[in-house]
Amino acid sequence: TPLLYALSRASNSSIPQLVAVSEYLLAHRARLTGMEKEQVKRIGTDFEWFRDRMSSETVAELEPALMELYEMFGVEPVAKRKMYDGHSDIKVTKSSWQEQFDQLWDLLVPSCGAASTVQGEAVRVCGRLAHELLDNGGINWDDDFQTMAESLTSYLVQGEPLDESERAEAGKIIAGITRAGLIRGGEDALARLTELTVRWVLKNPGPLALKETSYMR
């Protein structure tokens, strides 16, 4: 439908215009498919993910329109993204490593570029590797991705390192990532690497400043 199409194509900058279009279409009895709420949630999620990249003026312009959109479609507002302040201890409240990873990602990983801390960058690297190796099948894999993967080895020995057996396990998994964009052990190996990374971050709650990286990804 025209309404669903407009919602699915919306970006942050077009939210005010989207509100006007939605109001017009709904006033003229636009047919609802049941998928509109999902798109509004997507729009809100994208807005919060990029909140840290927007100026305060841009947020002040777009956020009220986003709130109108939530109300218009009866959608619970997406929680505001709270970014790490750069100096407090890094903490999580969840119990499973998967949920802890998600919390660390939301807290420490910026919407674009490298993180400010080694902990955040280790989490970011795991996320990037999972997306490229599992979701994309390694189609974009190049020397820069390889360097990024190998850098994780150096991150996990900083501060309070993993114990010797865990360091060896992480190193073996990283060494099993080939220059063809494949990982020995597949999804299970990458999940274990991510679990070990989360464990290392939780052993190092104090922020470790990240130096300039040797990769651009």
Give each language-model segment a name.
Residues 7, 26-27, 55, 71-74:
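Ankyrin-repeat helical core positions
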Residues 57, 72-76, 107-114, 132, ...:
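Surface-exposed polar/charged interaction patches
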Residues 1-12, 34-52, 85-95, 109-139, ...:
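Ankyrin-repeat boundary/"N-cap" motif
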Residues 18, 59-66, 80, 101, ...:
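Short amphipathic alpha-helical segments that mediate assembly, nucleic-acid/protein binding
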Residues 17-32:
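Ankyrin repeat domain, specifically the short helix-to-loop turn at the C-terminus of the second helix
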Residues 155-217:
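Charge-dense, extended regions
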Residues 57-99:
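Non-catalytic, alpha-helical, charged scaffold/linker segments
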